[in-house]
């Protein structure tokens, strides 16, 4: 998928349901992310002559979702950048499953971090789930005796992806956004090397 800045802005504004009276506030937030050098490798801003990709669009959509929960912009963009491989795997799975319209529910779980860093802390701050693993491994926790914290955010990756693609086509006038080769590449990468933090589809094969 290739977008101009105008298409990127229009798609994100529609995704976030930005009221026309608030478009100036939205653009100010986009400039704030530019100052944070997010997404990495691009210079977000009106009039910048460059091409944006599905990855840039989705990184911004995810960051805005996290910022919307009250997390500071710097913390949100740092989290998306650090764990982008995990979001990428979720979108790759969602894309392939949406094509078959079955078992397409794909979730990214963002677990609460301890206020004070500790040795051996859980690295699975961001994990990928299907409906089964979300129910069995996330929604049933934390047990009172478990060490896990109660705070978490669950992002519906399949819904986000499908909505962004639809708006990129309808509002941004991007041609065939859902057929972006990036999505197929992410899906293929996940299929070939599913990681331990990816619990969907029964999790990665256990080596013997």
Where are these regions (language model features)?
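A short, Lys/Arg-enriched interface patch at domain edges and termini
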Residues: 55-81
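Basic amphipathic alpha-helical segments that dock to polyanions
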Residues: 30-36, 52
């Amino acid at each position: 998928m290739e977008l101009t800045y105008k298409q990127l802005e229009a798609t994100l504004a529609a995704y976030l349901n930005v009221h026309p009276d608030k478009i100036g506030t939205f653009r100010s937030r986009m400039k704030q992310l530019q100052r944070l050098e997010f997404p990495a490798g691009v210079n977000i801003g009106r009039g910048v002559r460059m091409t944006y990709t599905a990855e840039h669009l989705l990184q911004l959509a995810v960051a805005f979702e996290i910022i919307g929960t009250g997390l500071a912009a710097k913390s949100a963009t740092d989290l998306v950048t650090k764990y982008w491989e995990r979001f990428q795997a979720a979108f790759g799975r969602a894309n392939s499953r949406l094509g078959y319209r079955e078992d397409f529910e794909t979730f990214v779980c963002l677990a609460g971090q301890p206020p004070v860093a500790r040795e051996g802390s859980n690295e699975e701050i961001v994990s990928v789930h299907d409906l089964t693993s979300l129910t069995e491994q996330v929604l049933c926790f934390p047990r009172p005796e478990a060490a896990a914290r109660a705070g978490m955010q669950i992002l519906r990756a399949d819904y986000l992806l499908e909505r962004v693609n639809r708006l990129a086509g309808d509002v941004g006038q991007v041609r065939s956004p859902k057929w972006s080769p990036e999505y197929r590449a992410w899906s293929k990468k996940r299929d070939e090397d599913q990681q331990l933090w990816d619990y969907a589809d029964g999790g990665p094969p256990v080596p013997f």
